[in-house]
Structures are given as C-alpha cells and as structure tokens.
Amino acid sequence: MQPKFNNQAKQDKLVLTGKILEIIHGDKFRVLLENNVEVDAHLAGKMRMRRLRILPGDLVEVEFSPYDLKLGRIIGRK
C-alpha cells in the first residue's frame, strides 16, 4: 500500500510581484512588493541552478510561506 502525501503545503504558498531594491549578499535581496511592503528574499534553488542574474530594478515573483511573511523566495523574473 502506497502512502498518500498531502499536497496542502504547496497550496498554502502566497505569491506576490515585487521590484528588486538592492542586493544584500550573494543570493539575498531586498524587494519592494506591489503592496508597498519591503521584505528580504533569497533565490529559489532552480533559479540558483540556472544562474539567472537578478539586478536592482528587475520585477520578480516572490513566494511566501504563511508562517513567515517577512522572508520570501524569488521563484521567477517577469
């Protein structure tokens, strides 16, 4: 019998659009979200593997966990 995994954690993610304000260190960035809130975000693993370059002024998609809305993951560039 195969165990059933709950995919609820993936559905609880919150995705917002933001603009990169500054590069803090390596893969950490300060992002201004569309609702005028500044948060810190780091690159997601797939973006790090693809070695995509993110510069100040770029529009990005930021994913948040419902448990910590101050730290996000950059999952894509627009």
Swiss-Prot record:
Domain S1-like: 4-78
Family matches, as PROSITE patterns: S1_IF1_TYPE (PS50832)
Sorted UniProt keywords: Cytoplasm, Initiation factor, Protein biosynthesis, RNA-binding, rRNA-binding
Location(s), subcellular: Cytoplasm
Matches recorded under Pfam families: eIF-1a
GO annotation, cellular component aspect: cytosol
Family annotation (InterPro entries): NA-bd_OB-fold, RNA-binding_domain_S1_IF1, TIF_IF1
Chief localization: cytoplasm
Keyword Lipid biosynthesis: no
GO MF, any single term: rRNA binding
Top-rank taxon: Bacteria
Oligomeric and partner information: Component of the 30S ribosomal translation pre-initiation complex which assembles on the 30S ribosome in the order IF-2 and IF-3, IF-1 and N-formylmethionyl-tRNA(fMet); mRNA recruitment can occur at any time during PIC assembly.
Job description of the protein: One of the essential components for the initiation of protein synthesis. Stabilizes the binding of IF-2 and IF-3 on the 30S subunit to which N-formylmethionyl-tRNA(fMet) subsequently binds. Helps modulate mRNA selection, yielding the 30S pre-initiation complex (PIC). Upon addition of the 50S ribosomal subunit IF-1, IF-2 and IF-3 are released leaving the mature 70S translation initiation complex.
Family the UniProt entry places it in: Belongs to the IF-1 family.
Protein name per Swiss-Prot or TrEMBL: Translation initiation factor IF-1
Record organism: Mycoplasma pneumoniae (strain ATCC 29342 / M129 / Subtype 1)
Taxonomic lineage from the root: Bacteria, Bacillati, Mycoplasmatota, Mycoplasmoidales, Mycoplasmoidaceae
